[in-house]
Structure formats: C-alpha cells, structure tokens
Curated annotation (Swiss-Prot):
UniProt similarity note: Belongs to the AB hydrolase superfamily. Hydrolase RutD family.
Xref: Pfam families: Abhydrolase_1
Transmembrane segments: none
Function: Involved in pyrimidine catabolism. May facilitate the hydrolysis of carbamate, a reaction that can also occur spontaneously.
Gene behind this protein: rutD
Record EC number: 3.5.1.-
Name of the protein in its database record: Putative carbamate hydrolase RutD
InterPro entries, A to Z: AB_hydrolase, AB_hydrolase_1, AB_hydrolase_fold, Pyrimidine_utilisation_RutD
Any single GO BP term: uracil catabolic process
Length: 266
C-alpha cells in the first residue's frame, strides 16, 4: 500500500490524515503538504485499486472496505488520535471510520468534509452516469479529458491547459482497471449519510467546506448536511469548483487550519 507520513519535529504534534476523492491518490493533496507539515504530522495515502497494477476490487465493494483500509494503516503506524480531512469520497471514508471503528485505539479529533453530501444529488448522478458512459464507450482518454470539466472552474481550466494535459497523460499511463473505477463509482453513488451516521457526526467537531460554483456537487448538499449538525461549521466559498483544494489552496488551507486550531486536543 502506498502512503507517505511526514513527521513533525515535535513528537507531541497532532496527526492529520488526508483522504482524496474518486481518483484515490494521495498526491491530490500536494497543495496542502507544505502548510500542514509546519504544524502537524501529516499522512497521505493511495486508496486501494487506484493504480494500473492494482488487483481487481471485490464484488460489492463499499465504504466498509475503504474505511477498513485506513483503520489497518493507522494501526500499522501506531496512530491513535488524529484529525481527518476528506474530499468528497474521502470525507465519507472519515464518516465510516468514525461510525464503524471509533474506539480507544481509533479516535477522530475532528472531521473536515469538502464538497460532501447527505445523499446523491440528481445533478451529481447525471455527472457520474456521463462519466461511466465515457469510460465504457469512449475509453480512458475521453474519461480523463472530461474530468477537468467536473473538477475546476472554466477560467482556471483556460489558464492551466498545459498543466492539465501533462496530468492527464500521467494519469492515463497509470490508469486502474476499468472494473475498479466502476466499483468505486458504484459505492460512491450508493452512499448515504443516514440517521445513525448523523448521530455519529454530532459527537465530533465537524467542518463542512463547499463551493458555490461546484459543477459536480451542488453546494446546497453541504448546506443540507450542515443543517442536521447543530454544532458543525460551514464554510461556503463563491469560487473554486469541486477541487478548490487545488484552485483556491491558500484560502482553503487557512480555513482548515483555523478549524483544526479550534478543535485541538486538550
């Protein structure tokens, strides 16, 4: 399993675990590493099944598998107490980790959910089914070429075309088995933050970050989830798209750091 653990010089610093979205790669968080390493031990990891060499994921693959993977990694690294920051799918992994495995040996200090939802929005479903059709009928290159349209604002795409082309070429060379992508998408489309999980979240410091120009997940989904969590924080940004951790990294980093300071362990 691929992971990177960046240790702070202060052994007593808290841990922060970053979990990426559908792509599954820890490298998604490059724009966060330098900032967060100044204050925390930082763990990033690749979710299983996300590389060209990956084995096929099990039938019925679900968030139980995704959360168990993190739990086992944390046990391997002897990490007991930690903040968890997740982007979309990655945030749901954090919810499942808290709901299924919270114990004296697995304690979430806080949970940050970026562009999350309580249940799948019809617009998001339409985006996902479009991506599935592209993958199945047009292939990997078309799937990756369209990906930026869902992640980034139009102006940002215009200004970063060369970078996106480089990234797409790199991703195509290490694209996972199509079956794995489809199983992960299926798990994501079925996931719901039900009443039991809402009750779990009420026991945690939670911060929701959403972008009004998100072309994949309507920001009202984060708003609706926030209304179910009386003590949660909501940070609503006008710009940045679905991947605002990339497009508006400085602002999003500061929001996340400010939240972690308010939920620091005592």
């Amino acid at each position: 399993m691929n992971y990177q653990l960046f240790k702070h010089s202060d052994e007593n610093a808290s841990y922060v675990v970053f979990s990426s979205g559908l792509g599954g790669h820890g490298s998604f968080w490059q724009a966060q590493l330098d900032v967060f390493r100044q204050y925390f031990h930082v763990l990033i990891y690749d979710q299983e099944g996300c590389h060209a060499s990956s084995e096929l994921l099990a039938d019925g693959y679900s968030f139980e598998h995704l959360a168990l993977q993190v739990k086992q990694l944390l046990q391997q690294l002897n990490i007991v107490r930690f903040h968890f920051i997740g982007h979309a799918l990655g945030g749901f992994i954090g919810i499942e980790l808290a709901h299924r495995y919270a114990s004296e040996t697995c304690q979430l200090l806080s949970l940050t959910l970026i562009n999350a939802w309580q249940q799948l929005d019809p617009h998001t479903l339409r985006c996902f089914t479009t991506r599935i059709a592209l993958l199945q009928h047009a292939g990997t290159a078309a799937y990756l070429h369209a990906q930026a349209l869902f992640l980034y604002p139009p102006l940002w795409i215009s200004e970063h075309t060369a970078l996106l082309e480089q990234q797409e070429a790199k991703m195509q060379s290490d694209f996972p088995p199509h079956a794995n992508v489809l199983k992960r998408l299926n798990a994501l489309m079925q996931y719901q933050v039900n009443t039991a999980r809402i009750d779990t979240l009420k026991q945690l410091p939670v911060c929701l970050i959403a972008n009004q120009d998100d072309m994949l997940v309507p920001y009202v989904q984060s708003l609706n989830l926030w209304k179910k969590l009386p003590d949660a924080q909501l940070k609503l940004l006008p710009y940045g798209g679905h991947a605002s951790t990339v497009t508006e990294a400085r602002q999003v980093n500061q929001l996340m750091l400010d939240f972690l300071k308010t939920s620091a362990p005592t």
